[in-house]
Amino acid sequence: MRDELVWIDCEMTGLDLRSDLLIEIAVLVTDADLNILGDGLDVVIHAPDEALDAMIPVVTEMHTRSGLIEEVRASTVDLATAEEMVLDYIRGHVKQAKTAPLAGNSIATDRGFIARDMAKLDDYLHYRMIDVSSIKELCRRWYPRIYFGQPEKGLAHRALADIHESIRELKYYRQTAFVAPPGPSTSDIAAIAAELGPPGKDAADTDSAAGHTTG
Protein backbone atom coordinates (compact mmCIF):
# COMPACT_ATOMS: atom_id res chain seq x y z
CA MET A 1 0.00 0.00 0.00
CA ARG A 2 1.26 3.49 -0.83
CA ASP A 3 1.48 6.38 1.62
CA GLU A 4 -0.86 8.69 -0.32
CA LEU A 5 -4.42 9.18 0.82
CA VAL A 6 -7.26 9.89 -1.61
CA TRP A 7 -9.74 12.27 0.00
CA ILE A 8 -13.21 12.38 -1.55
CA ASP A 9 -16.38 14.15 -0.53
CA CYS A 10 -19.72 13.93 -2.29
CA GLU A 11 -22.90 15.96 -2.20
CA MET A 12 -26.13 14.16 -3.01
CA THR A 13 -29.85 14.90 -3.26
CA GLY A 14 -30.21 12.71 -0.15
CA LEU A 15 -28.75 9.59 1.45
CA ASP A 16 -30.96 6.90 -0.10
CA LEU A 17 -28.91 4.77 -2.51
CA ARG A 18 -32.13 3.50 -4.08
CA SER A 19 -33.31 6.89 -5.31
CA ASP A 20 -31.01 9.83 -4.55
CA LEU A 21 -28.47 11.25 -7.00
CA LEU A 22 -24.81 12.17 -6.79
CA ILE A 23 -24.58 15.85 -7.75
CA GLU A 24 -21.08 16.93 -6.70
CA ILE A 25 -17.79 15.13 -6.13
CA ALA A 26 -14.47 16.60 -5.03
CA VAL A 27 -11.08 14.96 -4.60
CA LEU A 28 -7.72 15.82 -3.07
CA VAL A 29 -4.66 13.62 -2.63
CA THR A 30 -2.33 14.03 0.34
CA ASP A 31 0.93 12.43 1.34
CA ALA A 32 1.32 10.54 4.62
CA ASP A 33 1.85 13.81 6.50
CA LEU A 34 -1.40 15.25 5.14
CA ASN A 35 0.29 17.69 2.77
CA ILE A 36 -2.02 18.33 -0.18
CA LEU A 37 -0.68 17.28 -3.58
CA GLY A 38 -1.95 19.44 -6.43
CA ASP A 39 -4.94 21.73 -6.55
CA GLY A 40 -7.59 19.07 -6.23
CA LEU A 41 -10.77 18.87 -8.27
CA ASP A 42 -14.42 19.74 -7.73
CA VAL A 43 -17.01 18.56 -10.26
CA VAL A 44 -20.70 19.50 -10.27
CA ILE A 45 -22.90 16.92 -12.00
CA HIS A 46 -26.13 17.71 -13.80
CA ALA A 47 -29.40 16.37 -12.39
CA PRO A 48 -32.95 16.76 -13.71
CA ASP A 49 -35.32 19.23 -12.08
CA GLU A 50 -37.60 16.45 -10.86
CA ALA A 51 -34.74 14.99 -8.78
CA LEU A 52 -33.93 18.40 -7.28
CA ASP A 53 -37.60 19.11 -6.61
CA ALA A 54 -37.92 15.79 -4.76
CA MET A 55 -35.29 16.65 -2.15
CA ILE A 56 -36.47 16.94 1.45
CA PRO A 57 -36.68 20.53 2.78
CA VAL A 58 -33.50 20.45 4.88
CA VAL A 59 -31.42 19.26 1.92
CA THR A 60 -33.06 21.78 -0.41
CA GLU A 61 -32.26 24.58 2.02
CA MET A 62 -28.65 23.42 2.43
CA HIS A 63 -27.95 23.14 -1.31
CA THR A 64 -29.77 26.39 -2.04
CA ARG A 65 -27.76 28.29 0.55
CA SER A 66 -24.48 26.91 -0.82
CA GLY A 67 -25.42 27.72 -4.42
CA LEU A 68 -25.13 24.09 -5.47
CA ILE A 69 -28.65 23.72 -6.87
CA GLU A 70 -28.17 26.43 -9.47
CA GLU A 71 -24.75 25.02 -10.40
CA VAL A 72 -26.29 21.56 -10.83
CA ARG A 73 -28.98 22.95 -13.12
CA ALA A 74 -26.37 24.78 -15.19
CA SER A 75 -23.89 21.88 -15.36
CA THR A 76 -23.49 19.85 -18.54
CA VAL A 77 -21.28 17.21 -16.87
CA ASP A 78 -22.70 13.69 -16.57
CA LEU A 79 -21.59 10.93 -14.19
CA ALA A 80 -19.29 9.22 -16.68
CA THR A 81 -17.45 12.44 -17.48
CA ALA A 82 -17.15 13.34 -13.81
CA GLU A 83 -15.71 9.89 -13.07
CA GLU A 84 -13.03 10.26 -15.74
CA MET A 85 -12.09 13.73 -14.46
CA VAL A 86 -11.66 12.44 -10.91
CA LEU A 87 -9.70 9.40 -12.07
CA ASP A 88 -7.38 11.55 -14.19
CA TYR A 89 -6.56 13.69 -11.16
CA ILE A 90 -5.96 10.68 -8.89
CA ARG A 91 -3.79 8.89 -11.47
CA GLY A 92 -1.57 11.96 -11.62
CA HIS A 93 -0.56 11.30 -8.01
CA VAL A 94 -1.31 7.61 -7.45
CA LYS A 95 0.10 5.62 -10.36
CA GLN A 96 -0.97 2.13 -9.30
CA ALA A 97 -4.55 1.03 -8.72
CA LYS A 98 -5.72 -0.39 -5.39
CA THR A 99 -2.80 1.12 -3.44
CA ALA A 100 -4.19 4.30 -1.84
CA PRO A 101 -7.03 4.18 0.71
CA LEU A 102 -10.05 6.44 0.55
CA ALA A 103 -10.20 9.05 3.32
CA GLY A 104 -12.86 11.45 4.55
CA ASN A 105 -15.61 12.00 7.10
CA SER A 106 -18.36 9.34 7.33
CA ILE A 107 -16.77 8.13 4.13
CA ALA A 108 -18.79 4.91 3.85
CA THR A 109 -21.78 6.97 2.72
CA ASP A 110 -19.77 8.58 -0.07
CA ARG A 111 -18.28 5.25 -1.08
CA GLY A 112 -21.73 3.76 -1.42
CA PHE A 113 -22.63 6.32 -4.08
CA ILE A 114 -19.20 5.98 -5.72
CA ALA A 115 -19.59 2.20 -5.92
CA ARG A 116 -23.07 2.60 -7.41
CA ASP A 117 -22.30 5.33 -9.95
CA MET A 118 -18.52 5.26 -10.54
CA ALA A 119 -17.40 1.64 -10.54
CA LYS A 120 -14.03 2.35 -12.19
CA LEU A 121 -13.19 4.92 -9.54
CA ASP A 122 -14.26 2.58 -6.77
CA ASP A 123 -12.12 -0.18 -8.24
CA TYR A 124 -9.05 2.09 -8.47
CA LEU A 125 -9.11 2.80 -4.73
CA HIS A 126 -7.84 0.45 -2.05
CA TYR A 127 -10.60 -1.36 -0.20
CA ARG A 128 -9.47 0.14 3.11
CA MET A 129 -10.82 3.50 4.25
CA ILE A 130 -9.67 6.11 6.76
CA ASP A 131 -12.69 7.67 8.41
CA VAL A 132 -11.97 10.79 10.45
CA SER A 133 -15.36 10.49 12.13
CA SER A 134 -14.23 7.19 13.70
CA ILE A 135 -11.33 8.99 15.38
CA LYS A 136 -13.74 11.69 16.50
CA GLU A 137 -15.99 9.11 18.15
CA LEU A 138 -13.04 7.47 19.93
CA CYS A 139 -11.86 10.84 21.21
CA ARG A 140 -15.36 11.55 22.51
CA ARG A 141 -15.12 8.39 24.61
CA TRP A 142 -11.44 8.37 25.56
CA TYR A 143 -10.28 12.00 25.38
CA PRO A 144 -13.29 14.29 25.91
CA ARG A 145 -11.10 17.38 26.29
CA ILE A 146 -9.73 16.78 22.81
CA TYR A 147 -13.22 16.15 21.46
CA PHE A 148 -14.73 19.31 22.93
CA GLY A 149 -11.65 21.40 22.12
CA GLN A 150 -11.60 20.64 18.41
CA PRO A 151 -11.50 23.64 16.04
CA GLU A 152 -14.84 24.93 14.86
CA LYS A 153 -15.95 23.61 11.51
CA GLY A 154 -17.22 25.64 8.60
CA LEU A 155 -20.72 25.10 7.28
CA ALA A 156 -20.11 25.41 3.55
CA HIS A 157 -21.64 22.02 2.68
CA ARG A 158 -19.64 21.98 -0.55
CA ALA A 159 -17.52 18.99 -1.41
CA LEU A 160 -14.05 20.53 -1.75
CA ALA A 161 -14.47 22.74 1.31
CA ASP A 162 -15.59 19.69 3.31
CA ILE A 163 -12.42 17.81 2.32
CA HIS A 164 -10.23 20.67 3.54
CA GLU A 165 -12.17 20.58 6.82
CA SER A 166 -11.62 16.82 7.15
CA ILE A 167 -7.87 17.11 6.52
CA ARG A 168 -7.65 19.93 9.06
CA GLU A 169 -9.57 17.84 11.58
CA LEU A 170 -7.26 14.84 11.16
CA LYS A 171 -4.23 17.12 11.59
CA TYR A 172 -5.76 18.25 14.89
CA TYR A 173 -6.27 14.69 16.13
CA ARG A 174 -2.77 13.71 15.03
CA GLN A 175 -1.27 16.48 17.16
CA THR A 176 -3.51 15.98 20.19
CA ALA A 177 -4.59 12.33 20.41
CA PHE A 178 -1.79 10.34 18.78
CA VAL A 179 1.62 9.53 20.26
CA ALA A 180 4.26 11.89 18.86
CA PRO A 181 6.69 10.39 16.31
CA PRO A 182 8.64 8.16 16.40
CA GLY A 183 6.20 6.60 18.88
CA PRO A 184 6.88 4.35 21.88
CA SER A 185 10.19 2.55 22.29
CA THR A 186 10.53 -1.02 21.06
CA SER A 187 10.61 -2.28 24.65
CA ASP A 188 7.44 -0.37 25.55
CA ILE A 189 5.68 -1.78 22.49
CA ALA A 190 6.73 -5.32 23.42
CA ALA A 191 5.51 -4.83 26.99
CA ILE A 192 2.09 -3.60 25.83
CA ALA A 193 1.75 -6.50 23.38
CA ALA A 194 2.67 -8.98 26.13
CA GLU A 195 0.16 -7.44 28.52
CA LEU A 196 -2.65 -7.83 25.98
CA GLY A 197 -1.80 -11.51 25.66
CA PRO A 198 -2.44 -13.95 22.81
CA PRO A 199 -5.45 -13.80 20.46
CA GLY A 200 -8.63 -14.97 22.14
CA LYS A 201 -7.37 -14.34 25.67
CA ASP A 202 -10.21 -11.96 26.54
CA ALA A 203 -12.82 -14.36 25.17
CA ALA A 204 -11.31 -17.24 27.15
CA ASP A 205 -11.33 -15.17 30.33
CA THR A 206 -14.99 -14.28 29.74
CA ASP A 207 -15.94 -17.92 29.18
CA SER A 208 -14.07 -18.93 32.33
CA ALA A 209 -15.85 -16.31 34.41
CA ALA A 210 -19.25 -17.27 32.99
CA GLY A 211 -18.71 -20.91 33.83
CA HIS A 212 -17.57 -20.26 37.39
CA THR A 213 -20.16 -20.97 40.08
CA THR A 214 -19.98 -20.32 43.80
CA GLY A 215 -21.10 -22.83 46.40
From Swiss-Prot:
<dbReference type="InterPro" id="IPR013520">
    <property type="entry name" value="Exonuclease_RNaseT/DNA_pol3"/>
</dbReference>
<dbReference type="InterPro" id="IPR036397">
    <property type="entry name" value="RNaseH_sf"/>
</dbReference>
<keyword id="KW-0269">Exonuclease</keyword>
<keyword id="KW-0540">Nuclease</keyword>
<dbReference type="InterPro" id="IPR022894">
    <property type="entry name" value="Oligoribonuclease"/>
</dbReference>
<comment type="similarity">
    <text>Belongs to the oligoribonuclease family.</text>
</comment>
<feature type="region of interest" description="Disordered">
    <location>
        <begin position="196"/>
        <end position="215"/>
    </location>
</feature>
<dbReference type="Pfam" id="PF00929">
    <property type="entry name" value="RNase_T"/>
</dbReference>
<dbReference type="GO" id="GO:0000175">
    <property type="term" value="F:3'-5'-RNA exonuclease activity"/>
</dbReference>
<keyword id="KW-0963">Cytoplasm</keyword>
<keyword id="KW-0378">Hydrolase</keyword>
<comment type="function">
    <text>3'-to-5' exoribonuclease specific for small oligoribonucleotides.</text>
</comment>
<dbReference type="GO" id="GO:0003676">
    <property type="term" value="F:nucleic acid binding"/>
</dbReference>
<feature type="domain" description="Exonuclease">
    <location>
        <begin position="5"/>
        <end position="170"/>
    </location>
</feature>
<protein>
    <recommendedName>
        <fullName>Oligoribonuclease</fullName>
        <ecNumber>3.1.15.-</ecNumber>
    </recommendedName>
</protein>
<feature type="active site">
    <location>
        <position position="127"/>
    </location>
</feature>
<dbReference type="InterPro" id="IPR012337">
    <property type="entry name" value="RNaseH-like_sf"/>
</dbReference>
<dbReference type="GO" id="GO:0005737">
    <property type="term" value="C:cytoplasm"/>
</dbReference>
